[in-house]
């Protein structure tokens, strides 16, 4: 179990522009402040990931995404709420309320409310975070802290300890407007 002190340290680092690694439900994640352009571009460079692909935002609770939901139909909110917290990611219209370094070339953004205790505690302190699998492009996602260190030795500002959540696969991704599964979990 990771200490609250360590999570608070990670929160301070993120606010200062850090890129960190942390355990999630299925694999290790890389994260940073979605509003910090330099941090997001650094994360993308570490992964060799093109900015136009877009990124996932994770949160502690659905209220952290309220700024995106002002004009959403109530059934959309209910649909997301019924699956969160948990391994469900929803593609939702971003209505140009997020920067392009988060959304990429898409009219939607991927959102998830995590049920991993470390992620939830961290997001409760800093708000929504960028979350992407911890791996360089083309390599398998890190499932151990050792693999995180092998992939990114000395390139991350902090590696937040803790155990993975026990899921075998990443979250399912669905389109909120259609309900269509874009990526099986």
From Swiss-Prot:
GO cellular-component terms in the record?
cytoplasm
Which keywords annotate this record?
Answer: ATP-binding, Cytoplasm, Nucleotide-binding, Nucleotidyltransferase, Transferase, tRNA processing
Q: Which InterPro entries match?
A: DHBP_synth_RibB-like_a/b_dom, Sua5-like_dom, TC-AMP_synthase, TC-AMP_synthase_SUA5
Q: Which PROSITE patterns match?
A: YRDC
Q: Does the keyword ATP-binding apply?
A: yes
Per UniProt, the enzyme's principal EC class comes to: transferase
SUPFAM superfamilies according to UniProt? YrdC/RibB (SSF55821)
Indicate whether Ion transport appears among the record's keywords. no
Q: What would be an example GO MF term here?
A: L-threonylcarbamoyladenylate synthase
The reaction(s) annotated as catalysed by this protein in its Swiss-Prot or TrEMBL entry are: L-threonine + hydrogencarbonate + ATP = L-threonylcarbamoyladenylate + diphosphate + H2O
Chief place of localization: cytoplasm
The record's EC number reads 2.7.7.87
Compartments it resides in:
Cytoplasm
Using the record's annotation, list all stretches that form the YrdC-like domain.
4-185
Protein's job: Required for the formation of a threonylcarbamoyl group on adenosine at position 37 (t(6)A37) in tRNAs that read codons beginning with adenine. Catalyzes the conversion of L-threonine, HCO(3)(-)/CO(2) and ATP to give threonylcarbamoyl-AMP (TC-AMP) as the acyladenylate intermediate, with the release of diphosphate.
The family line of this record is: Belongs to the SUA5 family. TsaC subfamily.
From the Swiss-Prot or TrEMBL record, give the protein name.
Threonylcarbamoyl-AMP synthase
What taxonomic ancestry is recorded?
Bacteria, Pseudomonadati, Pseudomonadota, Gammaproteobacteria, Pseudomonadales
């Amino acid at each position: 179990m990771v200490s609250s002190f360590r999570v608070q340290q990670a929160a301070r680092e993120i606010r200062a522009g850090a890129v960190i690694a942390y355990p999630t439900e299925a694999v290790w994640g890389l994260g940073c402040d979605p509003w910090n352009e330099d941090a997001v571009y650094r994360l993308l460079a570490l992964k060799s990931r093109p900015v136009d692909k877009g990124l996932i935002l994770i949160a502690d609770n659905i209220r952290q995404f309220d700024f995106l939901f002002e004009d959403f139909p109530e059934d959309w909110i209910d649909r997301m709420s019924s699956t969160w917290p948990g391994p469900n990611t929803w593609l939702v219209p971003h209505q140009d309320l997020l920067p392009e370094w988060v959304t990429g070339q898409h009219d939607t953004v991927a959102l998830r409310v995590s049920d991993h205790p470390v992620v939830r505690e961290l997001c409760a302190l800093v708000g929504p975070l960028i979350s992407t699998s911890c791996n360089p492009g083309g390599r398998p996602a890190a499932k151990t802290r050792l693999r995180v260190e092998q992939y990114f030795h000395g390139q991350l500002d902090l590696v937040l300890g803790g155990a993975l959540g026990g899921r075998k696969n990443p979250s399912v991704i669905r389109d909120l407007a259609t309900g269509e599964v874009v990526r099986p979990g």
